[in-house]
Amino acid sequence: MDIDEQIIQDYSNSKLDVVQIDGLVVLKIIKQCKEYLPELVPGQLLGLDIGTSLEVSNCFPFPPRDQEDENSESIADYQLEMMRFLREVNIDSNTVGWYTPTYLNSFFNESVIETQYNYQATINQKCVVIVYDPIKTSQGTLSLKCYRLTQSFMELFKDQSFSRERLDQANLSFNDIFEQIPIKIHNSQLINALLYEFDGASNNLTNSFDRLNISNNIYLEKVVEGMTDCLESLNQELNKVYINQRNIQTQKTNYIQQKFLEGQKVDEDELASMIKPLNPPSKLTSLLLTNQINNYTDQIHSFSGNSLTKLSLLKDLQK
């Protein structure tokens, strides 16, 4: 039994209800992502696996691409060295996943899928990926989401089988690639007391009308642009499928015409054997594009809902 088969069999025992992240880790992720912008540099998550929860207590960024090339040091060696340093100072060094910054939550791609699969297949089925969106966070709402691959998708990815028949057999749609895990931000009692004081001081502010600002046209435009790009890419994938089907049909037509000219009957078994096997395009790209389009529509829906709420409040204030 190889490691992939063992991972799939044990997946049902890896129930994960919540991911608890220290507030300091959230601040470190935001700070590290801001320092490396516009480059999107991912990083490692460290913590503990406790029952049906995952506790994230520390993190560190991976080396940027240019530094990695200059030092000729692989990311794996860098991770091992960092975790060795953390163990020396008695800090949790257990890998529980990784984080990655993204623009407009556009992280549904094959690179992320492959990285997350390797984490779950080789380290722990409960390993997660935390996605941070600096653009959406700049709009006033912390955008931090946690995902891991589903069991059904892990099975398909292990076999690299994403044909139409295999997807139908597994009953897998674009919604079945990732499962989202709830995030709980945890702070110490001292930090909670400090935040309580800050919250009390902010309540003394007399003017909070700036929160009703709805001039986020740039954000909405970027989301629509991203959706348009995904739709164009999806159309290209559909064209590949159409060309593949047309080539198969051309082979069948040529065979039937040849038999007709020879005055012979068409043998279905012979026809099936005469058709040259064509490699159909993988449906993985189409699944990821569809998932990303669905993600963009959710963002537009959320943006529209918040804007309508603000408009309603402004209307009441004008009365």
From Swiss-Prot:
Keywords: Cytoplasm, Initiation factor, Protein biosynthesis
Keyword Protein biosynthesis tagged: yes
GO biological process: formation of cytoplasmic translation initiation complex; translational initiation
Superkingdom of this protein's organism: Eukaryota
GO annotations of cellular component type: eukaryotic 43S preinitiation complex; eukaryotic 48S preinitiation complex; eukaryotic translation initiation factor 3 complex
GO terms of molecular function: metallopeptidase activity; translation initiation factor activity
Family, per entry: Belongs to the eIF-3 subunit H family.
PANTHER family per UniProt: EUKARYOTIC TRANSLATION INITIATION FACTOR 3 -RELATED
Name of the protein: Eukaryotic translation initiation factor 3 subunit H
Organism: Dictyostelium discoideum (Social amoeba)
Gene name in the database record: eif3H
